[in-house]
């Protein structure tokens, strides 16, 4: 179940800091540096959500930036703190539906560090919703293992998303 992140600040921040320096989460962080998660008290520039299990525990976090001038979304962040892929996956799907159907944003652009286990799922999602792989930045980011990684860029337009739903 989705809820706004501001309602779960303490539990969410604890879950996020537990991921610091963990090999399993190195791709989410996208960097060698960690900082405390900033939960905004407004939704003008960013939408922030938590995924909750049936008992109301935070099992994941989903956010994206909003450009109000272009009505485009970017910087999609998705992290699952649990092994509950079913509920979390349904919540990610709800966020995608909301971006294009509820909020009627124009486009979603996001990226993934190549090698991240979620990359294949993103490729399938892009194909399912009529999006595209925009390109690849070579050696774009350095992770906690000291290695440089390529980054794949994606985009889905509202038009292609709605067309895929027919």
List each language-model region with its residue ranges.
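Acyl-donor (CoA/ACP) binding surface of acyl/acetyltransferases
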Residues: 1-16, 48-166
